Amino acid sequence: MHERNTTTNTPLDVTAQKLLVAQRSVDTLVQEGVLHAHMSIGLGTGSTAMPAVKRIADHLARGTLSDIAAVPTSFQTALICERYNIPLFSLSSKRIGGKLDVTIDGADEIDTQNFVIKGGGAALLQEKIAAYNSAHFVIIVDETKVVETLGTRAALPIEVVPEARMSVMRTLQDWGLSVHIREAVRKKGPVVTDHGNFILDARWQSLPTRTPQDMERALNALPGVIENGLFTERTVRVFVAHADGSVEERSASF
């Protein structure tokens, strides 16, 4: 299904698109009953996921949602949930039992097959654990994240144990990718994930010869790779905000 609705005469910037798609997607899921009381919800990380968390908090305050159990995918998300008094659980807690009803998250890129690159916020491991253990996976993005081929604009993040950084980098270079260790912004040295690992950012120097599914599996087979930012193993429901104020749905309803 490709459905768009509501337009505006004033083009929306990217920040406004992120807010629009976060609010519209959560409202739609609540109206359809996809989001409802007593659910377990995985909450993503990043600049589009955060306003979705806020919208869920709005529904809790109104009473249109109640008694939900939220599983955050990063410390950033956990802090936002605490601010809005959203009940927090771990995926392994007794109430959750390792399985989520739905996960809502943003993306760095999404292609025409609804395959996704995530991990710009270095939370790809927790994000994938949540997404791949959810009955439903919802991606919300602004229109700049939509590409024909993954890797067009965003780097592919790969989480590695520190000891494996050089061996994995060498293998990726042999595969024809350019790769570097992601450097931290407000401290010296590399980004360290919530799990104590490093992030390698890889880019294709030419069109990839492997399919996204094959690349996801091949990367995870390398010794020392914990996880990578390709999400290809789940059916995804996608909401895309556009500058004209419309929100497009790019996959079938649940």
From Swiss-Prot:
Positions that bind substrate: T45, G46, S47, T48, D105, G106, A107, D108, K118, G119, G120, G121, K145
Active site: E127 (proton acceptor)
GO MF, one example: ribose-5-phosphate isomerase activity
A Pfam entry, by short name: Rib_5-P_isom_A
The reaction(s) this protein catalyses: aldehydo-D-ribose 5-phosphate = D-ribulose 5-phosphate
GO BP terms, alphabetized: D-ribose metabolic process; pentose-phosphate shunt, non-oxidative branch
GO cellular component, one term: cytosol
InterPro entries referenced in this protein's UniProt entry, alphabetically: NagB/RpiA_transferase-like (IPR037171), Ribose5P_isomerase_typA_subgr (IPR020672), Ribose5P_isomerase_type_A (IPR004788)
Pathway annotation: Carbohydrate degradation; pentose phosphate pathway; D-ribose 5-phosphate from D-ribulose 5-phosphate (non-oxidative stage): step 1/1
Keyword Electron transport listed: no
This protein's record includes keyword Isomerase: yes
Record's keyword terms, sorted: Isomerase
Matching SUPFAM superfamilies: D-ribose-5-phosphate isomerase (RpiA), lid domain (SSF75445), NagB/RpiA/CoA transferase-like (SSF100950)
Enzyme nomenclature, EC number: 5.3.1.6
HAMAP family the record matches: Rib_5P_isom_A (MF_00170)
Oligomer status and interactors: Homodimer.
Family (UniProt): Belongs to the ribose 5-phosphate isomerase family.
Annotated NCBIfam families: PRK00702.1, rpiA
Function per UniProt: Catalyzes the reversible conversion of ribose-5-phosphate to ribulose 5-phosphate.
Protein's name according to its UniProt entry: Ribose-5-phosphate isomerase A
Protein species of origin: Treponema pallidum (strain Nichols)
Gene that this sequence comes from: rpiA
